[in-house]
Amino acid sequence: MVAAPTTATELKLGVDCVIADINQAAFGRKELDIAETEMPGLMALREKYGTEKPLKGARIAGSLHMTIQTACLIETLVELGAEVRWASCNIFSTQDHAAAAIAAQNIPVFAVKGETLEEYWEYTHRILEWGDGGSPNMILDDGGDATGLVMLGSKAEQDITVLDNPSNEEETFLFASIKKKLAQDPTFYSRTKAEIQGVTEETTTGVARLYKMQKSGELPFPAINVNDSVTKSKFDNLYGCRESLVDSIKRATDVMVAGKQALVMGYGDVGKGSAQSLRGLGATVCIAEVDPICALQAAMEGYRVVRLEDVVEEMDIFVTATGNYQVIRNEHLEKMKDEAIVCNIGHFDNEIDVASLKGYEWDNIKPQVDHITLPSGNRIILLAEGRLVNLGCATGHPSFVMSNSFTNQVLAQIELFTKGNEYGKEVYVLPKHLDEMVARLHLDRIGAKLTELSKDQADYINVPVEGPYKPDHYRY
């Protein structure tokens, strides 16, 4: 059940926004206060740059899960001088009290947990629309939807036929929203694109979209790949998923994980964390992989590496973590045992062929938990309609690990906004010394004390005493 959106007029905030309930703002503020104690990186950036305000003049269109942790990110960007407009990058991931806390500060936010796809694309458009008729000059993206909207809309201005044949439900609503906007303002997207100085991207999926544009020569502005900062991918993707996956499964189903047979599809950083998560609670975990290196890693960690087709009838829990398309298809779904749990922790909902299940009997148990009766008579439990389970059925990653990721995001925004003319129309990563700085900012909070190199030791391994300590090609 979607909460009725509350408009800014009703709130009398003097700011345009769409949220579920402004009365949750006080609750959101209390949780924000707790989160700040677990986000030392962001707090350090506020202290370091708060007076200087390096983002003064930045107009940031933010498309990223509207959680309590994201609210801390937003407040940091504003503290550093930026103007911000924000939408969630997933229809189920918003925490309504977090959105209310941001709206109460007169920051434009457009996010409601359980929003429709039509609303989702409307809200993504809203972050590109400044009240004075201007445009954003920066994008902070998660999954690439805001960047992709600007790019596809620009193409449609030149050739409307690119919107003729949507391939799925998501594209149907996306294409309709672009057509609607073009009817109102035929040059909206090209004007917006021309103003963008750079984009910073949070996720593996969004980064892949950026590299694809770079390869084809279509990338119109510099981009920073935040995902491949070591302090993002090796922490958020791995340790974040290690805690949030089982949290979401247990909140959704109350199932006992110990003793269950679980299959994790994909053994990248997200898959590694997911496998550890399930094993840690006593599940017997198998891995499905296409990459021989990742498959060998899984085998060496003691996981059984299998093909989905060979074990689909045995597994109690299925988790997709690939970032790919149609990983679990209808022929697999129909063979699953009774009460098998099916979920996705990759970015988009098309890893599982949810569309093929629409003709079956659905019984909604509670928000984002559905029983689906298969032709065999067996029922499977689908979580978050195949979208991100840890944000749909729980609250995502813990604050501490998100501080790593979001500290990288702020540094990337500062870098592109203040030095954008030094970058070409390519995808970059943050330099190693900033990666190490992000890690250093988080050590005190967990009581970690660094050993220091002597000058002789540093010379012996040919690194500066103060770092960086590893070459760029080092894999960690």
Curated annotation (Swiss-Prot):
Q: Where in the cell is it found?
A: Cytoplasm
On cofactor binding, the record's note says: Binds 1 NAD(+) per subunit.
Molecular function, one GO term: adenosylhomocysteinase activity
Which species?
A: Parasynechococcus marenigrum (strain WH8102)
What are the record keywords, sorted?
Answer: Cytoplasm, Hydrolase, NAD, One-carbon metabolism
PANTHER family linked to this entry? ADENOSYLHOMOCYSTEINASE
Protein name, please?
A: Adenosylhomocysteinase
Q: Name one Pfam family in it.
A: AdoHcyase
Spell out the CDD domains in the cross-references: SAHH
Q: Which principal EC class is assigned to this enzyme? A: hydrolase
Q: Where does substrate bind?
A: T67, D142, E202, K232, D236
The entry's cellular-component GO terms read: cytosol
- Known EC number: 3.13.2.1
Catalytic activity line of the entry: S-adenosyl-L-homocysteine + H2O = L-homocysteine + adenosine
Where is it predominantly found?
cytoplasm
Q: What does this protein do?
A: May play a key role in the regulation of the intracellular concentration of adenosylhomocysteine.
Output one GO BP term. S-adenosylmethionine cycle
Q: Which residues bind NAD(+)?
A: 203-205, 237, 266-271, 289, 324, 345-347, 390
Kindly tell me the pathway this chain contributes to.
Amino-acid biosynthesis; L-homocysteine biosynthesis; L-homocysteine from S-adenosyl-L-homocysteine: step 1/1
